[in-house]
Design a protein with these regions (language model features):
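N-terminal secretory signal peptides and thylakoid transit peptides that target proteins
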Residues: 1-11
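Conserved redox-cofactor binding core of oxidoreductases
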Residues: 41, 46-49, 161-264, 270, ...
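Beta1/beta-strand and adjacent pyrophosphate-binding region of the FAD-binding site
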Residues: 73-87
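Glycine-rich FAD pyrophosphate-binding loop
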Residues: 99-116
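Rossmann-like flavin
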Residues: 134-196, 440, 444-459, 465
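Glycine-rich loop(s) and the adjacent beta-strand/alpha-helix scaffold that form part
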Residues: 260-263, 267-343
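An anion/pyrophosphate-binding glycine-rich loop and adjacent beta-alpha core
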Residues: 318, 322, 328-451
Length: 482
């Protein structure tokens, strides 16, 4: 029989919401350097402790740099609204504000608009109506998620997001279509409470750009912003916020530096400053403070910040906006730790973002969980397994067995209109994966155990026990849904 394997190492991407950046202008203060050895480059687990200064916990990134002197500012830009960041959040803000009559300046440390990923959710949209997809009822799902978070969430924001999602998505659909983009529906899981679809952008039709077409969407927004007269400035990095009355009044502007020569620009906002500049996953000290569980995955070495990067599993941006907010007295969210964007492996799953729902074993050759979960959930449990590795094991008749249970096979990123995969297509895909090392194939459990470095005798016992439970129709070990 053909046994195939996937390496289900949980891959971690960006953490929490955020901004851009590395060390602020003028370098770190002596106090900051003394506060944390992480300022010298690498951070390790022994550094991940709170530093107490003036009776409060402080990390070095919480300590503000010296203000940029007025005589070093070579240019001043004034407008109604200043938007910091040229991604989806920044450009949707700029376009929406300009449509309502505001004069807007958007500046970004990147050299062009940039975004990544995809999978845009809305409860309903004109595209869904065109395809006959029923609106999503979030109540069971939202309640489940809130309970899982011990209700440490802002319910007003959650429900506002739901209630206004249709209007917002239709707005974006119009902008995308105006620029020549197609808006298609991407399949998601059907076995859990979440929505089983998401909106994606494409220039190819079907699934060619599903989950990667967000760059096309942000470029469409840039074109719309230009038509509306938004002033757009690239290669300019935010350094410090300007807050009146000794950090007790309103935020009135931003000090930024030009990437080309380091000269300083003051952006003055008559109405508001909007921070929309990315995440903080490339500041390892911030990860240690707010999202420590991902540090072993992304590594402890402090990486260089590339504002033009599309994706990087070891961290993207450096949290400049969050730092600037902290320096002028902004509050951090109370829910802790911050939610990382993590994803387990999809090998052997019939769901687009599912996990292999058959037998899973860890490096100790033990079955370690109920397998009927989504890939993101599986990655959390993998973090507690030896080596952060697990193996899904199945036989060549597994595709047909799933079909016999009334399910269908869909892979990640498939357009809603595409037909399900056939067993022959799946086996061919897995065989191709064997050639690249993504899967392992064996005729016996002994051979499989040898390839994977598992205990052959224990693997036979685990498989026998799993088959016994399958025959009973009841998972007496982990109570998985049969």
């Amino acid at each position: 029989r053909d046994f195939l394997k996937f390496g289900a190492v949980g891959a971690a991407g960006a953490a929490a919401a955020g901004i851009v950046g590395c060390t602020p202008s003028g370098g770190a203060t002596d106090e900051a350097k003394a506060a944390s050895p992480a300022m010298d480059g690498a951070i390790n687990s022994s550094d991940a402790v709170l530093k107490l200064t003036d009776g409060m916990p402080k990390w070095s990134f919480m300590i503000p740099p010296e203000p940029v002197p007025d005589d070093q500012i070579t240019e001043t830009v004034e407008n109604d609204i200043i938007v910091v960041g040229g991604g989806m959040s920044g450009f949707t803000t700029a376009v929406s504000a300009a449509e309502q009559g505001a004069k807007v300046t958007l500046f970004s440390a990147a050299s062009a608009p940039i975004s990544r990923g995809g999978s845009n959710y809305a409860k309903n949209s004109k595209v869904m109506e065109e395809l006959g997809i029923e609106p999503f009822d979030p109540v069971p799902f939202y309640y489940h998620e809130m309970r899982a978070a011990s209700f440490a969430v802002d319910q007003q924001k959650w429900m506002r997001g739901y209630n206004e999602s249709e209007e917002a998505m239709n707005w974006m659909i119009d902008i995308a279509r105006e620029s020549g983009l197609q808006v298609i529906m991407e399949r998601d899981n059907t076995f859990d409470l979440g929505p089983n679809y998401a909106h994606a952008f494409s220039t190819e039709g079907n699934s060619a750009m599903v989950s990667t077409g967000q760059q096309g969407a942000v470029e469409a927004l840039e074109a719309k912003a230009q038509k509306l007269g938004v002033e757009i400035i690239y290669d300019t990095k935010a350094e410090q916020l300007i807050r009146e009355d000794d950090n007790k009044g309103r935020v009135t502007g931003v000090i930024a530096s030009k990437m080309a020569d380091g000269s300083y620009v003051k952006f003055v906002a008559k109405q508001a400053v909007v921070l929309a500049t990315g995440d903080f996953s490339n500041d390892k000290e911030m990860l240690a403070a707010y999202c420590p569980m991902v540090l072993p995955l992304v590594g402890y070495e402090q990486g260089e910040i590339d504002y033009n990067t599309s994706f990087n599993l070891t961290g993207i941006y450096g949290g400049d906006g969050q730092k600037m907010g902290l320096w002028v007295g902004a509050a951090w969210q109370h829910a802790y730790p911050n939610a990382p964007m993590m994803q387990g492996a999809w090998g052997g799953s019939h769901e687009p973002c599912g996990f292999h729902m058959g037998l899973n074993v860890n490096m100790n050759t033990e079955r370690y969980q109920r397998e009927d979960i989504s890939a993101p959930y599986s990655s959390n449990h993998l973090l507690s397994q030896p080596g952060n590795v697990a193996y899904g094991i199945w036989t060549a008749n597994y595709p047909q067995a799933i079909l016999d249970k009334g399910h269908e096979w869909y892979s990640f990123g498939m357009d809603y209109t595409l037909p399900p995969l056939t067993p022959d297509e799946l086996v061919a895909m897995w065989d191709a994966g064997v050639e690249t090392g993504a899967y392992f194939k064996a005729d016996t459990l002994d051979d499989l155990a040898k390839q994977l470095g598992l205990d052959a005798a224990k693997l036979k016992e685990v498989v026998a026990r799993y088959n016994e439970l399958c025959d009973k129709g009841v998972d007496e070990d982990f109570y998985k849904n049969p």
